[in-house]
């Protein structure tokens, strides 16, 4: 996937850039800021670079350049779109923007005289893992979350007045959740016996396709069956943003919050009407107030969730973390429940600390279509319908581009035009009160068919069960040779009784020609054993919804805490000696004057002193006991002549424990088991 490259372009001398003695520059040296994992588990991202001050030579020679102050600030900017209320809240610039300082560096705290040339100052910061990613929210894209590095310098050249220079560099922060095992979901649709099994990936990406495996089971029962007619899918994005007001208009926001709370209480007394959304339906914007009972966005008790709830066949997917826990592992289940309870309590505390609980919710459909073919139906036994399809998300653009790594006052950053942003990756930030979730909704329309024979005779329950298991064999036996290619007519017979009667007459005519004989009563025995289905006019809509985790691709990078630290040898100064250097002397001595002879694992190694002169190695022979009842272990026993001695590491054989061998009449030295298992000595 290729992103349009953003470069820092500009004209030298524009906006008075040529008459300044001091030029500022920002250069990012660290990899792109990618937060790996969910907000509760992410280790953050490292941001490091250089801020440069270039003093022109002419200004320095004229009287010197004194930099009074040079600061660098990393700030988070949240621009709120329309608050959907008239009055000062919609027109106040302070209410529409919120700034938060994440880090601050006093590069030059006191006045300092700088010589002509380039001066570089490094900086670094660890971005917290719970920060929201750079995002554009809503259908209009007016609400945005951005990060910027702002360099501010105040200088005085040649004894003149103080002048100020400012430089901004946008910092792109993205979040990537690594893909795990696919999720298997099971849905049940009472009062029918139909069950749906879906297989979905754990995470999805913008500008990609989502594989979906769907299987319907239990579509055949007794004398009826369900035939799939259409499948409709859509992806809904739910955005919830807490309203923001400046200190001057905070009282007006509280009054608006009380009005919305009273209106919500009145609406709760009325029966909720479900909203039937379609793929071509526009965004739906609602205003709500968070309470202690409903602190989290998109809970079952929220207004938007109650309106979209359908008690018939809606089944929310469970938390993705529970899919990795074995049902019998109660300890891990309890630990997960405690963790979720703590997170919920923290979010409750965050809600209570906030000055307002007024939220703006927007629900929109970002993708969806209908599928009318492509599945396979098998009506043998209990029956099943299988479908494997690709959900197209290639038109979804999250606005992520290549990051800008270098800007300067002579070449400032100018944003180029790009494709409109129509999707936002998942965001969960209780501090800002911003939440973005995605749901995949699947609706399957199945039509009911009544099974009967081609002559119109209905099936009893016992016959239907017997025919369901051996329907293929019965059809093969009853089908004449002349109708071997009438599969298309059989499909038409399942659609309408008129085609069934036509096929029945054709089958009888062919059966009379190919039948070897008739029954005593003049009727054929297997001519009318074919089973067809006739639509009854009844249909059901099977609705399912699955929670999707939309995230950016991780790329080739890894988290900073997963990187391998440098070795001692890679640090050029004050590093301790390596292992090889410490034992090089002993290794050289051992390699020139020692050998090791050992038996299998069942026998301890036998060491005997060996002469230092390069003589013929001692003969190794098998003793007479090797052919006894001890087996292979005894056959592998090696005996060393008493004239030889073996030693390791320059140790004297006298220090080793001696064992008398009565059968051979000489002494051998045996090492301890702990010394035999010393891998360092063995490798040396």
Swiss-Prot record:
Q: Where is this region: Disordered?
A: 462-483, 510-531, 593-632
Compartments annotated for it: namely: Cytoplasm; Golgi apparatus
Single Gene Ontology BP annotation: ubiquitin-dependent endocytosis
Q: Which InterPro entries match?
A: Arrestin_domain-protein, LDB19_N
A GO MF label: ubiquitin protein ligase binding
Low complexity compositional bias, start-end = 593-602
- The yes or no answer to whether the keyword Cytoplasm is present is yes
Function comment = May be involved in protein-linked oligosaccharide phosphorylation.
Write down what this protein is called: Protein LDB19
What species was this sequence derived from? Eremothecium gossypii (strain ATCC 10895 / CBS 109.51 / FGSC 9923 / NRRL Y-1056)
- What's the encoding gene here? LDB19
């Amino acid at each position: 996937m290729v992103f349009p490259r953003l470069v820092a372009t500009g004209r030298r001398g524009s906006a008075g850039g040529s008459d300044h003695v001091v030029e500022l520059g920002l250069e990012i040296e660290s990899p792109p800021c990618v937060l790996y994992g969910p907000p509760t588990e992410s280790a953050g991202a490292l941001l490091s670079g250089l801020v440069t001050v270039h003093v022109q030579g002419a200004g320095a020679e004229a009287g010197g350049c004194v930099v009074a102050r040079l600061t660098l600030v990393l700030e988070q900017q949240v621009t709120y779109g329309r608050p959907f209320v008239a009055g000062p809240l919609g027109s106040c610039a302070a209410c529409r923007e919120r700034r938060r300082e994440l880090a601050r560096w006093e590069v030059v705290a006191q006045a300092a005289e700088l010589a002509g040339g380039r001066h570089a100052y490094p900086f670094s910061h660890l971005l917290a893992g719970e920060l929201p990613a750079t995002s554009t929210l809503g259908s209009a894209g007016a609400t945005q979350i951005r990060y910027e590095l702002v360099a501010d310098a105040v200088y005085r050249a040649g004894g003149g007045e103080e002048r100020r220079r400012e430089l901004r560099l946008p910092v792109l922060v993205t979040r990537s959740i690594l893909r795990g095992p696919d999720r298997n979901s099971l849905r049940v649709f009472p009062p029918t016996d139909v069950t749906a099994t879906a297989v979905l990936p754990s995470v999805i990406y913008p500008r990609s396709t989502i594989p979906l495996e769907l299987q319907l089971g239990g579509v055949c029962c007794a004398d009826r069956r369900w035939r799939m007619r259409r499948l409709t899918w859509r992806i809904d994005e739910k955005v919830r943003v807490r309203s923001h007001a400046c200190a001057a208009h905070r009282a007006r926001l509280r009054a608006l919050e009380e009005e919305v709370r009273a209106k919500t209480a009145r609406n709760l007394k009325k029966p909720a009407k479900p909203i039937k959304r379609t793929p071509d339906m526009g965004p739906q914007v609602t205003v709500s107030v968070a309470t202690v009972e409903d602190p989290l966005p998109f809970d079952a008790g929220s207004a938007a969730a109650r309106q979209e709830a359908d008690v018939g066949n809606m089944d929310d997917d469970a938390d993705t973390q529970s899919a990795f826990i074995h049902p019998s592992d109660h300890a891990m289940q309890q630990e997960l429940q405690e963790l979720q309870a703590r997170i919920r309590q923290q979010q409750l505390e965050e809600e209570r600390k906030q000055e307002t609980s007024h939220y703006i919710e927007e629900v929109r459909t970002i993708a969806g279509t209908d599928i009318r073919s492509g599945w396979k139906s098998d009506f043998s036994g209990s029956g099943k319908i299988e479908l494997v399809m690709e959900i197209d998300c290639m038109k979804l653009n999250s606005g992520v581009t290549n990051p800008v790594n270098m800007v300067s006052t002579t070449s400032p950053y100018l944003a180029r035009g790009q494709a409109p942003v129509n999707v936002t990756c998942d965001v969960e930030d209780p501090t800002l009160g911003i939440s973005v979730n995605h749901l995949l909704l699947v609706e399957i329309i199945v039509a009911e068919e009544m099974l009967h024979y081609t002559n119109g005779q209905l099936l009893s329950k016992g016959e239907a069960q017997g025919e369901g298991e051996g329907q293929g064999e019965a059809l093969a036996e009853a089908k004449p040779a002349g109708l071997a290619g009438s599969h298309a007519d059989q499909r038409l017979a399942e659609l309408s009784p008129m085609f069934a009667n036509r096929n029945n007459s054709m089958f009888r005519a062919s059966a009379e020609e190919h039948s070897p004989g008739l029954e005593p009563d003049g009727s054929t025995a297997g001519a009318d054993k074919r089973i067809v289905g006739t639509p009854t006019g009844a249909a059901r809509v099977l609705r399912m919804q699955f929670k999707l985790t939309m995230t950016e691709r991780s790329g080739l990078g890894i988290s900073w805490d997963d990187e391998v630290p440098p070795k001692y040898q890679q640090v050029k100064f004050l590093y301790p000696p390596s292992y090889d250097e410490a034992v090089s002397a002993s290794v050289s001595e051992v390699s020139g004057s020692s050998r090791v002879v050992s038996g299998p694992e069942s026998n301890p190694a036998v060491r005997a002193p060996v002469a230092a002169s390069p003589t013929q190695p001692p003969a190794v022979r098998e003793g007479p006991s090797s052919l006894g009842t001890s087996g292979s272990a005894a056959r592998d026993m090696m005996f060393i002549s008493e004239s030889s001695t073996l030693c390791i590491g320059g140790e004297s054989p006298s220090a080793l424990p001696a064992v008398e061998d009565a059968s051979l009449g000489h002494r051998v030295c045996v090492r301890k088991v702990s010394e035999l298992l010393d891998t360092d000595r063995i490798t040396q």
